[in-house]
């Protein structure tokens, strides 16, 4: 059975088999959690992302998909990069956000990861409303068949933590 836990803090300080990165499609680092993971993880992550871009991901990683790289200097074996959707008030993109969680867990299963740390995908510069993002995240991981034994949501601030806690009941 998969356990779901919540932590308020910095995802780059977590110890897990895999840390999920809310990446942009370029995979070359950016702001928010993406930039923090690249900075703390060191150049090995960026080097592997560049190799992926030079290979089968020449046009970048599509929204809702996931791919793994080394974790570099992080206390993890892998970073699973996933590209969340940008929030839209006029188009329902919730299926793409759910896909980020499902595809990350599928990738974790392929790697043999048992513990996975997730950020609140798309809630930063992509402006997804926190309560809705928490609902989608918790519902998706709770209903996805996986061999992962611990899913840890690592929430940056109290507002995010409270939104996820409300969804876990």
Swiss-Prot record:
PROSITE patterns associated with the record: MACRO
Pfam families: Macro
Family matches, as SUPFAM superfamilies: Macro domain-like
Disulfide bonds: none
Macro domain span: 1-169
InterPro entries tied to this protein: Macro_dom (IPR002589), Macro_dom-like (IPR043472)
Transmembrane domains' residue ranges: none
PANTHER family: GANGLIOSIDE INDUCED DIFFERENTIATION ASSOCIATED PROTEIN 2-RELATED, MACRO DOMAIN-CONTAINING PROTEIN
Similarity annotation: Belongs to the MacroD-type family.
Protein's UniProt name: Macro domain-containing protein SCO6450
Upper lineage: Bacteria, Bacillati, Actinomycetota, Actinomycetes, Kitasatosporales
